[in-house]
């Protein structure tokens, strides 16, 4: 039991450092070619911080553990909104630009409605469903690129540091990707062993520990953004990452190895995935995005409320 736990921790550390280096490399390259910062945050950073979820869910689906593939995607969305974004809001509430959030928020709820529709009707995420989700991902990227195409470059463009060469940035990108792949493999294999040893359903492990572990890059980004006074960037990254969790993470998983919604636990006589996880996902995203869209601000009570929801969600997961 000790070895799987240690390897699980090593996997998490690889994911954290891999995600950190990947984002540094990708952001450095984007800045080198004068790509607007908002586009970097909406695409490159979100893709980079979502890579752990992509790797974990794909490997889980390929190894026949569809519960982890599903639970990691949905669990990461809930974790991103009600823990990571909530922490940043509770610590440092502030104003945001509603216009910059409209596209990711719209895409999220369109994708979430489609995802939930499949879950409630068939419960089976087939290869065609995966391809539709990937098409949504492509559309999201295209819309962001088009929206930012005519955006002015930052007034003060920082010159790349002497030691931050193009080769170094490519190296960070490549090594980060490798660490993410290794970490994801360790996380899935040993997370499954721990779940079996404790008698805990894989879906619960995926919705809590694995989801939290693969969301750590978003947490690192959120803390960094807070430290530099860019809380809105953190919110944009969280929402963008949640879009990717639905359309990219689940899309790749379903395309590579179709999976079904897990039915390990029941709540009120129904599948807990359908009566608990989806409603919580929609609830936390609505609570996170509506004040930002209509009032242009994020308040401390909003962050505290989201944290309370996440705490209750975790307690319920381990008691049903």
Locations of regions flagged by a protein language model:
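Hydrophobic alpha-helical segments, chiefly the membrane-spanning helices
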Residues: 1-320
């Amino acid at each position: 039991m000790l070895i799987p736990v240690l390897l699980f921790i090593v996997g998490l550390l690889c994911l954290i450092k891999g995600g950190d280096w990947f984002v540094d490399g990708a952001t450095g390259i984007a800045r080198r070619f004068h790509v607007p910062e908002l586009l970097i945050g909406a695409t490159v950073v979100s893709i980079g911080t979502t890579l752990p979820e992509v790797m974990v869910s794909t490997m889980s689906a390929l190894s026949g553990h569809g519960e982890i593939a599903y639970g990691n995607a949905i669990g990461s969305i809930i974790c991103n909104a009600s823990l990571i974004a909530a922490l940043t809001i509770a610590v440092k509430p502030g104003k945001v630009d509603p216009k910059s959030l409209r596209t990711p928020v719209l895409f999220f709820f369109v994708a979430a409605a489609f995802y939930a529709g499949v879950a409630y009707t068939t419960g089976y995420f087939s290869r065609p469903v995966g391809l539709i989700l990937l098409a949504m991902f492509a559309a999201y990227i295209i819309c962001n690129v088009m929206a930012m195409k005519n955006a002015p470059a930052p007034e003060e463009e920082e010159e790349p540091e002497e030691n931050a060469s193009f080769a170094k940035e490519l190296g960070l990108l490549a090594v980060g990707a490798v660490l993410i792949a290794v970490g994801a493999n360790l996380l899935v294999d040993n997370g499954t062993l721990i779940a079996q040893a404790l008698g805990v359903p894989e879906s619960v492990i995926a919705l809590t520990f694995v989801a939290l572990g693969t969301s750590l890059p978003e947490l690192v980004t959120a803390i960094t953004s807070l430290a530099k006074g860019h809380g809105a960037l953190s919110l944009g990254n969280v929402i963008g990452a949640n879009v990717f969790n639905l359309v990219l993470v689940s899309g790749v998983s379903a395309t590579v190895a179709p999976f079904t919604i897990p039915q390990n636990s029941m709540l009120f006589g129904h599948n807990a995935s359908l009566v608990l996880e989806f409603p919580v996902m929609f609830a936390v995203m609505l609570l996170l995005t509506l004040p930002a869209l209509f009032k242009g601000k994020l308040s401390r009570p909003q962050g505290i409320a989201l944290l309370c929801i996440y705490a209750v969600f975790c307690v319920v997961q381990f008691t049903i």
